[in-house]
Design a protein with these regions (language model features):
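Sequence/fold signature of self-assembling virion shell proteins
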Residues: 1-47, 51-52, 215-352
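Long, hydrophobic/aromatic-enriched structural stretches that serve as scaffold segments
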Residues: 29-106
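A general structural signal for short secondary-structure junctions and capping/turn motifs
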Residues: 80, 194-196, 296-297
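Helix N-cap / beta->alpha transition motif
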Residues: 91-95, 206-209, 319
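Alpha-helical scaffold segments that mediate packing/assembly in large oligomeric complexes
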Residues: 93-182
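Hydrophobic, Leu/Ile/Phe/Ala-enriched alpha-helical segments that form helix-helix packing faces
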Residues: 121, 125-128, 184-195, 232-236
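Extended, solvent-exposed, turn-rich assembly/linker loops in the middle of proteins
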Residues: 144-228
Length: 352
């Protein structure tokens, strides 16, 4: 590499790095797959506000000259949400560039570090949306926050796990499958039975392992292609789907939120929810952006460091009852559903 052109290096920072860092890719941001984004007018706001109304009163009978006629009333309640911020920095030097492109190496170190910076901010945003900030003074609740604290609905664990239902050795697969189907329908009904929500259809989000199990074939010689997915999305309500959609969300795996020990600490979570702004939305004050200017460091201008910043309120939950936490779909034993080949071999072994 003949020399180091600081002008070229500086332009790389913005022509190559910025598109990687600043573009909020939806496939990388799990929370944005589930909820819509609301951008605040003030990027440096410390808080944001919203109001909800409480309607009281009822009609009454009337008699001539009656004076005890009931009066209705509407009260407006103001809520305050908090904004959190996080920064991530990107740096590279002449030595980095030369080392990455000599000795038979051809490494795009600029792009790789830009992606790492993007991922750092994206991971923080998702952690805030799903886990909250754990700050008692300025709380931001996440989807996996304790339901009693956040006000979410819950449902008792199902009587069977998804692993058991789809296990090829399960001779009662269809009977167990209907238990799971009814469990999901009961979870959806927690929302659809609320006043004013009878005609809505919630979404289901669950960990990728459980999502995969929904697509595994059930043991049945007459319907070999039958799956839990078919039954959930073709069952009840005259053949209509139970959910508006089913989404695999990595952040719902136990390793990202579950602080318990033993088997309980390996149980994943699922969420049944509405994605409308009246229930919840992601409050963004400032999308990832450059913070300040990249200035050449003291080593004769041979390296640059640029900081990026994001400011967000995480998930603003306005109607907690529109979110239902589900647990117990896996038992934490780490036992995976056996393949058909394994099950067949096991049966043959027993027969011999």
């Amino acid at each position: 590499m003949a020399g180091f052109n600081t002008g070229v290096a500086y332009s790389k920072l913005f022509n190559v790095v910025d598109p990687k860092v600043l573009e909020p890719k939806k496939e990388d941001l799990q929370g944005r797959k589930m909820f819509k984004v609301n951008t605040l007018a003030d990027p440096w706001a410390l808080t944001y506000e919203w109001s909800w109304k409480e309607i009281m009163g009822q009609s009454s009978g009337y008699a001539d000259r009656a004076t005890d006629i009931t009066v209705t009333d509407v009260s407006y309640h103001k809520e305050i949400g908090y904004i959190a911020e996080r920064t991530a920095a990107f740096e590279y030097s002449q030595a980095d560039l030369e080392r990455a492109n000599t000795g038979g190496r051809n490494i795009d170190i600029v792009t790789d570090r830009a992606v790492a910076t993007h991922d750092a901010l994206a991971n923080w945003e998702d952690a805030l949306i799903f886990n909250g900030n754990g700050d008692d003074r300025h709380p931001i609740y996440g989807l996996t926050t304790d339901a009693n604290k956040a006000g979410y609905q819950t449902i008792d664990d199902p009587s069977v796990t998804l692993q058991k239902v789809v296990d090829p050795t399960n001779e009662n697969a269809f009977s167990d499958a209907y238990k799971i189907v009814n469990y999901f329908m009961d979870a959806a009904a927690k929302i659809t039975m609320l006043p004013g929500y009878h005609n809505v259809k919630p979404y289901l989000a669950l960990a990728p392992k459980e999502y995969d199990l929904l697509t595994r074939p059930l043991v049945n010689q007459y319907n070999p292609d039958k799956t839990l997915w078919n039954m959930i999305q073709r069952g009840g309500n005259n053949g209509e789907n139970v959910f508006a959609g089913i989404r695999p969300i990595t952040e719902l795996e136990a390793q990202y939120w579950n602080n318990k020990t033993g088997k309980d600490g390996k149980k994943d979570m699922a969420i049944v929810y509405l994605d409308t702004p009246d229930v919840a939305q992601i409050q963004v004050a400032m999308e990832p952006r450059r913070y300040g200017q990249a200035v050449a460091s003291a080593d004769n201008g041979l390296s640059y460091k640029q900081m990026y910043i994001e400011r967000t309120g995480g998930l603003s939950v306005k109607f907690p009852a529109g979110i239902v936490q589900l647990a117990g779909l896996n038992d934490g034993s780490e036992k995976w559903a056996k393949s058909k080949a394994d099950a067949k071999a096991e049966r043959a072994k027993k027969e011999n």
